[in-house]
Amino acid sequence: MSTKKRRVLKIIILGDSGVGKTSLMNQYVQKKFTKEYKATIGADFLTKEIEVDDKKVTMQIWDTAGQERFQSLGSAFYRGADCCMLVFDVNNAKSFDDLDNWRDEFIIQAGPSDPDNFPFVVLGNKIDEVGVNRQVTEKKAKAWCASKGSIPYFETSAKEDINVEAAFTCITRNALRNEKEEELFVPDAVDMNTSATQRKRGGCC
């Protein structure tokens, strides 16, 4: 079996149930969106191969359940994460308030060596539904990100495919920028026979 030199990045998406984590992942990887809501049980992942700044990257994107009873997935799930997406619904204030808990949970479970410089990115999702019901302003979200060390922030819509690719490209660049200069060798053919078909933070681009 031949091998090809490429980087493998493990991306974990965290946030409350119903904020659109699965939809964002499906839109980015498969370019599809469904209105039907089906809660993720435990965790699931998809992979996507891309090229960023002349570097070949295999993104292993992990989508997690937002329900409390699944928050105890443990360090085994978080271990080896190269970057983390924190997602909230701009029309749901509680999902924004819970970002602190999700960020703390990740840092505790993943145990990054340098939490202050670990590559996070925050997505304010469902901007296609914005109207009188919007509860979290862009200014408020950016202020929270600034208070955590200038985390990049994107307003997204999985449904309309707004800023989805930009957000994933940003976090990939930051992960590559922060990773140690190690080369990972991965077999060309890896068939997970599941729904599977993506390392650290900083300014984007």
Swiss-Prot record:
Q: Which GO terms describe its biological process?
A: protein transport
According to the lineage, what is the superkingdom?
Answer: Eukaryota
Per UniProt, what is the membrane topology? Answer: Lipid-anchor
Where can this protein be found? Answer: Cell membrane
Recite the UniProt keywords alphabetically: Cell membrane, GTP-binding, Lipoprotein, Membrane, Nucleotide-binding, Prenylation, Protein transport, Transport
- Entry keyword Zinc-finger: no
Task: Spell out the family assignment given in the record's similarity comment.
Answer: Belongs to the small GTPase superfamily. Rab family.
Which positions in this protein are listed as binding GTP?
Answer: 15-22, 63-67, 125-128
* Listed name of the protein: GTP-binding protein yptV5
Select a single GO molecular function from the record's annotations and give it. Answer: GTP binding
- Tell me the Gene3D superfamilies matching this sequence: P-loop containing nucleotide triphosphate hydrolases (3.40.50.300)
Protein role: Protein transport. Probably involved in vesicular traffic.
Output a single Gene Ontology CC term carried by this record.
Answer: plasma membrane
Q: Note the SUPFAM superfamilies from the entry.
A: P-loop containing nucleoside triphosphate hydrolases
Residues with covalent lipid (S-geranylgeranyl cysteine) sit at 204-205
Motif: Effector region; annotated at 37-45
